[in-house]
């Protein structure tokens, strides 16, 4: 059997999906509050930058993978308009339910689907844009997921990955203290769940750095891959194209 990482823990590949699902079932109801606390609200600016770079226009078809509580899908649905199509998807039913309800409460009706990014249930060359924000690091076979994203995007379209990355070196020690001490403490105080937030910190540490992710996207068949460091590399936005 093949092994993979669940945070720092080595587990069988068949176990990882269930363990990740357990984390997000646990955090779903407090996800937005915790995002604001953990990032000091910066996650909103990171997503705004992603939305600006996406360039969604009326009539566009957009797939938001691991869309969680729907921040990107909400913006894209407004930009794509009634002639467009924006799918909010997530592999976790609890997260998808929170995202769907949040969009409905804002008066936004857009299709939602449970979706495994390694087996995307859409035809080839269907979307103008595919996005995944803070979800790739939780996937077992990242290159396979990226190849699937490339498959369903149209020639001329983009795949965009917004994810925690390698922080600027002078900030590493302070960032580690925050990630492994403060973050689990916040998780316990606000959500009553320190272990899930400890996993989130560990999953960030185990995720490929900026250059490694460029190579991974290129291996998946994407071209002209570039990245933008945000907040000293705490987060990076990677953009790959299909021709």
UniProtKB/Swiss-Prot annotation:
Database matches in InterPro entries: SAM-dependent_MTases_sf (IPR029063), UbiE/COQ5_MeTrFase (IPR004033), UbiE/COQ5_MeTrFase_CS (IPR023576)
UniProt xrefs under PROSITE patterns: SAM_MT_UBIE, UBIE_1, UBIE_2
The EC number(s) this enzyme carries: 2.1.1.163, 2.1.1.201
GO biological process: aerobic respiration; menaquinone biosynthetic process; methylation
GO terms of molecular function: 2-methoxy-6-polyprenyl-1,4-benzoquinol methyltransferase activity; demethylmenaquinone methyltransferase activity
SUPFAM superfamilies the UniProt entry points to: S-adenosyl-L-methionine-dependent methyltransferases
Catalyzed reactions: a 2-demethylmenaquinol + S-adenosyl-L-methionine = a menaquinol + S-adenosyl-L-homocysteine + H(+); a 2-methoxy-6-(all-trans-polyprenyl)benzene-1,4-diol + S-adenosyl-L-methionine = a 5-methoxy-2-methyl-3-(all-trans-polyprenyl)benzene-1,4-diol + S-adenosyl-L-homocysteine + H(+)
Residues the record lists as binding S-adenosyl-L-methionine: 69, 90, 116-117
EC class name: transferase
Pfam families per the UniProt record, alphabetical: Ubie_methyltran (PF01209)
Purpose of the protein: Methyltransferase required for the conversion of demethylmenaquinol (DMKH2) to menaquinol (MKH2) and the conversion of 2-polyprenyl-6-methoxy-1,4-benzoquinol (DDMQH2) to 2-polyprenyl-3-methyl-6-methoxy-1,4-benzoquinol (DMQH2).
Protein name (record): Ubiquinone/menaquinone biosynthesis C-methyltransferase UbiE
Organism lineage string: Bacteria, Pseudomonadati, Pseudomonadota, Betaproteobacteria, Burkholderiales
UniProt gene name: ubiE
């Amino acid at each position: 059997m093949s092994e993979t990482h669940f945070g720092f823990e080595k587990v069988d590949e068949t176990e990882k999906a269930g363990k990740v699902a357990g984390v997000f079932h646990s955090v779903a109801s407090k996800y937005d509050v915790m995002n604001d606390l953990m990032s000091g609200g910066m996650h909103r600016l990171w997503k705004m930058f992603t939305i600006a770079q996406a360039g969604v226009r009326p009539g566009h078809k957009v797939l938001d993978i691991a869309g969680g509580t729907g921040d990107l899908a909400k913006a894209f649905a407004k930009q794509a308009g009634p002639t467009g199509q924006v799918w909010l998807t997530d592999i976790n039913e609890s997260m998808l339910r929170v995202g769907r309800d949040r969009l409905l409460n804002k008066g936004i009706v857009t299709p939602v689907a449970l979706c495994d990014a390694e087996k995307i249930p859409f035809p080839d060359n269907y979307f103008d844009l595919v996005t995944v924000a803070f979800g790739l690091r939780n996937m077992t076979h990242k290159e396979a997921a990226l190849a699937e994203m490339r498959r369903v995007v149209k020639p001329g379209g983009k795949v965009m990955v917004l994810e925690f990355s390698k922080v600027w070196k002078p900030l590493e020690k302070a960032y580690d203290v925050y990630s492994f001490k403060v973050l689990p403490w916040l998780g316990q105080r606000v959500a009553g769940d320190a272990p899930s937030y400890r996993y989130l910190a560990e999953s960030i540490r185990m995720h490929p750095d900026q250059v490694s992710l460029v190579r991974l996207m290129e291996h998946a068949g994407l071209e002209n891959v570039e990245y933008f460091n945000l907040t000293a590399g705490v987060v990076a936005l990677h953009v790959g194209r299909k021709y």
